[in-house]
Amino acid sequence: MTAESMMFNGAVLLMVLVLVGLAWGFLLLKIQGGEAE
């Protein structure tokens, strides 16, 4: 594996983790907001 492919894989993995984190956080906020009301 070259350094370039490792950097590319790392960037893709980071993007996926960020998207999953945002979706998870949004879902938790939505659930908590629904319970509050």
From Swiss-Prot:
Cellular location(s): Cellular thylakoid membrane
Transmembrane segment boundaries: 11-29
InterPro entries, per the entry: PetM_cyt_b6/f_cplx_su7
Organism: Rippkaea orientalis (strain PCC 8801 / RF-1)
HAMAP family to which the protein is assigned, alphabetical: Cytb6_f_PetM
Oligomeric form and interacting partners: The 4 large subunits of the cytochrome b6-f complex are cytochrome b6, subunit IV (17 kDa polypeptide, PetD), cytochrome f and the Rieske protein, while the 4 small subunits are PetG, PetL, PetM and PetN. The complex functions as a dimer.
Signal sequence range: none
GO biological process, one term: photosynthesis
Name recorded for this polypeptide: Cytochrome b6-f complex subunit 7
Membrane association type: Single-pass membrane protein
GO cellular component: cytochrome b6f complex; plasma membrane-derived thylakoid membrane
UniProt entry tagged with the keyword Lyase: no
Molecular function, one GO term: electron transfer activity
Pfam name, any one: PetM
Keywords in alphabetical order: Electron transport, Membrane, Photosynthesis, Thylakoid, Transmembrane, Transmembrane helix, Transport
Keyword Transport: yes
Family: Belongs to the PetM family.
Purpose of the protein: Component of the cytochrome b6-f complex, which mediates electron transfer between photosystem II (PSII) and photosystem I (PSI), cyclic electron flow around PSI, and state transitions.
